[in-house]
C-alpha cells in the first residue's frame, strides 16, 4: 500500500500537468478557429468557403486532443476575451499583403496546435 501511495505521489503531478497542457492546447485550437474567422472576414472570404475548408481540420484537431470536455470553458474564455483577441488578430491582418498569404497564416496557426 505504501509503495502504491509513493508511486501515486510521483505520478500525480505529471498527470495534473498533462491535463493542464491538454486544456491549454484545446484553448489554443479554439483561438486558432476564432482567428481563422477573423482573417477570412478581413480578407473578404465567404463564411461558407471558410467553413468548408477549415471546419473539418478544426474538428479533427479538437477530437484528436479530446477537447469536448473543455468546450464550455473555452467558449466562455473566447467570449470573455473577444475584444482582446480581435485586436490581436486584426492588427496582424491589417498588414500589407496579408490577404495574399492569409491561408499560410491559418495553416501556421493550425500546425502549431494540431
How would you label these PLM feature ranges?
Residues 8-18:
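Hydrophobic h-region of N-terminal signal peptides that target proteins for export
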Residues 47-114:
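Compact alpha-helical subdomains of small soluble proteins
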Residues 1-8:
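Sec-dependent signal peptide recognition
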Amino acid at each position: 500500500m505504501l509503495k502504491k501511495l509513493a508511486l501515486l505521489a510521483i505520478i500525480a503531478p505529471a498527470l495534473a500537468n498533462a491535463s493542464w497542457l491538454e486544456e491549454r492546447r484545446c484553448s489554443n485550437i479554439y483561438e486558432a478557429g476564432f482567428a481563422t474567422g477573423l482573417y477570412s472576414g478581413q480578407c473578404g472570404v465567404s463564411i461558407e468557403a471558410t467553413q468548408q475548408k477549415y471546419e473539418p481540420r478544426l474538428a479533427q484537431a479538437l477530437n484528436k486532443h479530446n477537447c469536448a470536455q473543455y468546450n464550455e470553458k473555452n467558449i466562455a474564455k473566447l467570449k470573455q476575451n473577444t475584444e482582446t483577441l480581435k485586436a490581436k488578430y486584426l492588427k496582424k491582418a491589417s498588414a500589407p499583403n496579408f490577404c495574399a498569404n492569409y491561408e499560410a497564416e491559418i495553416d501556421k496557426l493550425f500546425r502549431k496546435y494540431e
